[in-house]
Amino acid sequence: MGTRSYRPYTPSTRQVTISDFAEITKTEPEKSLTVYKHRAKGRNNQGRITSRRRGGGHKRLYRIIDFKRDKRSIPATVIAIEYDPNRNARIALVSYEDGEKRYILHPNNLKVGTVIIAGPESPIEDGNALPLANIPLGTSVHNVELKAGKGGQIVRSAGATAQVVAKEGNYVTLKLPSGEVRLIRRECYATIGQVGNTDARNLSAGKAGRNRWKGRRPKVRGSVMNPVDHPHGGGEGRAPIGRSGPVTPWGKPTLGAKTRKPKKASSKLIIRRRRKSSKRGRGGRES
């Protein structure tokens, strides 16, 4: 897996960096594992926009991914590695000894023909799934459950990996990709290894059209709107926002204001908060 760039014969090809798709071995999805997925385009059940800047984009079929890895102690062979338009990670098609086929997230370095297995006694090899209690300290894992039997909920994006750093009582301590250190029940399952397509973070759309293909619409700054449309709007020329800090279109503080519930139940399981990440756009004062 790697990236591909182009000679700058147009402005967009000067900037674009795309995946070379070298690891893909099958172009058509497994029909029995795909379903039609209605795209909400940022609307709720009343048709009102609840998530701005979404809409359009290419049609997609949803691939049913096995996040639970609940087919225990039955070996499965990787028969294909495929592209999934619904996520930035690749997916692997595996065939179990009883003939059933399933999709899983493709771990880095997992090859076609490799045999994987899920269960408490599985060997510590990429693609195998085990309870956190049975995974040695220092091991890299992904697709981690937060509640036993619910299926993996965290560490699922391309290139993501968490590290097992401690075990004490009924909990295992994980260091997550965000830098957060938290406790997770020891009976929760996780998959060994790092999620594949590690170069996903190095890709560049190169042009607005590529984002439109993905269903991402333009983001208009509040300061160039009229006062009726945004609290930052109005003024003569390029006027400042006229406030002590940036706000949302509905007047709520944003870009740094804490939104986490102070009494959230999972707070007691977080040992160290995640690293701060800057979400400010150009100029640092827009939303």
Swiss-Prot record:
Q: Where is the composition biased (Basic residues)?
A: 209-220, 258-287
- UniProt cross-references to InterPro entries, sorted A to Z: NA-bd_OB-fold, Rib_uL2_dom2, Ribosomal_uL2, Ribosomal_uL2_bac/org-type, Ribosomal_uL2_C, Ribosomal_uL2_CS, Ribosomal_uL2_dom3, Ribosomal_uL2_RNA-bd_dom
Q: Which gene encodes it?
A: rplB
Q: Which UniProt keywords apply?
A: Ribonucleoprotein, Ribosomal protein, RNA-binding, rRNA-binding
- Sum up the protein's function in the record's words: One of the primary rRNA binding proteins. Required for association of the 30S and 50S subunits to form the 70S ribosome, for tRNA binding and peptide bond formation. It has been suggested to have peptidyltransferase activity; this is somewhat controversial. Makes several contacts with the 16S rRNA in the 70S ribosome.
Q: Which family does it belong to?
A: Belongs to the universal ribosomal protein uL2 family.
This protein's source sits in the domain of life called Bacteria
An example GO BP is: translation
* Stretches the record annotates as Disordered: 203-287
| Species per Swiss-Prot/TrEMBL record | Nostoc sp. (strain PCC 7120 / SAG 25.82 / UTEX 2576)
Quaternary structure and partners: Part of the 50S ribosomal subunit. Forms a bridge to the 30S subunit in the 70S ribosome.
Q: What is this protein called?
A: Large ribosomal subunit protein uL2
